[in-house]
Amino acid sequence: MRELTLTTTVFQTTKSQEIFAAAQKLMPGGVSSPVRAFKSVGGQPIVFDHVKGAHIWDVDGNQYIDYVGSWGPAIVGHAHPEVIDALHAALEKGTSFGAPCLLENILAEMVIAAVPSVEMVRFVNSGTEACMAVLRLMRAYTQREKVIKFEGCYHGHADMFLVKAGSGVATLGLPDSPGVPKATTAATLTAPYNDLEAVSRLFEQYPNDIAGVILEPVVGNAGFIPPDAGFLEGLRELTKQYGALLVFDEVMTGFRIAYGGAQEKFGVTPDLTTLGKVIGGGLPVGAYGGRAEIMKMVAPAGPVYQAGTLSGNPLAMTAGIKTLEILSRPGSYEHLDRITGKLVQGLLDAAREFGHEVCGGHISGMFGLFFTAGPVTNYEQAKQSDLKKFAAFHRGMLEQGIYLAPSQFEAGFTSLAHTEADIERTIAAARTVLSQL
C-alpha cells in the first residue's frame, strides 16, 4: 500500500497549476463542477492525488487536513479500509448490472429503518436526480403545480430549482441561470429561509395550487444555517393545513447530522425525503423516498416515470451499505459532535481574539463560519459576510495545510477519522492566519 507521508514541507503548487492550465483547454473553466475552480477565493485550484482518513495530498506533495470531505460523503474518513475491502469484493462481480441486485434490497432496508419518513425508496445517481424525480412525484400526487423553495437552498441544477439557489450559484453570484425558460420556473415560489410568515402568505395567496414545500432542513449550500426553533414544525403544520406535501432535501444532512438525518434530529417527519452523498460512501448516488402510498405512484408500480441506467449499481450500493454499517456503531455521532464543536469554538475564539467579526455553529459533523457579526438565519444575512476576508483566510489556511471549502457559501464537514490532534492543529493554523489578516 502507498506510504501516506508528507512529501514536502514547502507549500508550492507548480504541478497543480500545470494540470489546471491544461484542464482549461479541455473542460469549461477547467473543472467538472464550478465551485472547484476557486473563483470566489482567488488563485488556482489544488489538484489532488490521493486521500486517506482525514487527510488529502495534492500532486505537488502538499498534505492537508480535510474539512470538505468530498462535499459530505466521506463521513467515515477517506478510503476507509472496510469500505475499500467491500468494494474490492464487489468489483470482482462486475461494475454494473442494469438489473436488480440483492444489494439494493439491503441498502433500502437500512435507509427505511433509519429515516422516519421513508417507507419505500428509489435509488438514483445523484442528489439533483433525486430532487428532479421528487418534484415530479409531488406534483403528480397532489395534482398541483406550484412548489415553494427557499432562497439560498440548493436542490441540484435542474431548471425548476435554479431560482435564488445556493451552492455554486451563490458562490458565483448568479441570480439564476441563462437557458432556463421562464415557463419552467413560473410555478416555483420562493421565500426567505426561517420566515414562516412568508410561507403562510404564499399559501394564503395560492391555497389550492401549491403541491408542496421543499427545503434543506439545515441549509448547507448558503453556508451553514440551522432552522430557527419552530420553523420546521410550522412548515409541517402549514402543509397539512393546505393539503400540500413537505419534502426534506437531506442530500447533505441525511446520515450526517444524525443517523436518521434532520428529521430524526428535530423530530419533524416530512412526506418525502431526498438523499445522496453519505448513502453512496463516496460513489455517485441519490435516492428519494417517503410514504408508501406516494411512492407507489412511481413507475413501474404507478404512472410517474423515472429511470436510470446506473441506478442501484452494485458499487454504490456496496459502499453505502458498509458506510452505514460503520456509522451505526456506538459513539459515531458523539465523536462527530465533540470534535466539530471543539473546532468551531476554537475558530470563533481565535477570530474574535484578533478582532474579526464572525459567527458560526455546528450540528454533529456539519459546521460553518461566516465573516460577519451575525446572526445569520437566512441567505440575505449570509451575503453580508466579508468575502474578501474569507478568501484571504481560505488561502492562508491552505498554505498552513488546512483544506476548507473554497466558498463562504458552503458548509464544512468532519469525519470519524478526524482526531483531537487534527482539530488542535487546525485551530493553531487558524490563529496564525487570523493574526495576520
UniProtKB/Swiss-Prot annotation:
It is found in: Cytoplasm. Its EC number is 5.4.3.8. One of its GO terms (molecular function) is transaminase activity. GO terms for cellular component: cytoplasm. It comes from the Bacteria. The keyword Lyase does not apply. It catalyses: (S)-4-amino-5-oxopentanoate = 5-aminolevulinate. Keywords: Chlorophyll biosynthesis, Cytoplasm, Isomerase, Porphyrin biosynthesis, Pyridoxal phosphate. Its cofactor is pyridoxal 5'-phosphate. It is an enzyme of class 5 (isomerase). One of its GO terms (biological process) is protoporphyrinogen IX biosynthetic process. Pathway: Porphyrin-containing compound metabolism; protoporphyrin-IX biosynthesis; 5-aminolevulinate from L-glutamyl-tRNA(Glu): step 2/2; Porphyrin-containing compound metabolism; chlorophyll biosynthesis. The modification N6-(pyridoxal phosphate)lysine is found at K277. Its main location: cytoplasm. CDD domains: OAT_like. InterPro entries: 4pyrrol_synth_GluAld_NH2Trfase, Aminotrans_3, Aminotrans_3_PPA_site, PyrdxlP-dep_Trfase, PyrdxlP-dep_Trfase_major, PyrdxlP-dep_Trfase_small. Belongs to the class-III pyridoxal-phosphate-dependent aminotransferase family. HemL subfamily. Homodimer. This is Glutamate-1-semialdehyde 2,1-aminomutase. It comes from Thermosynechococcus vestitus (strain NIES-2133 / IAM M-273 / BP-1).
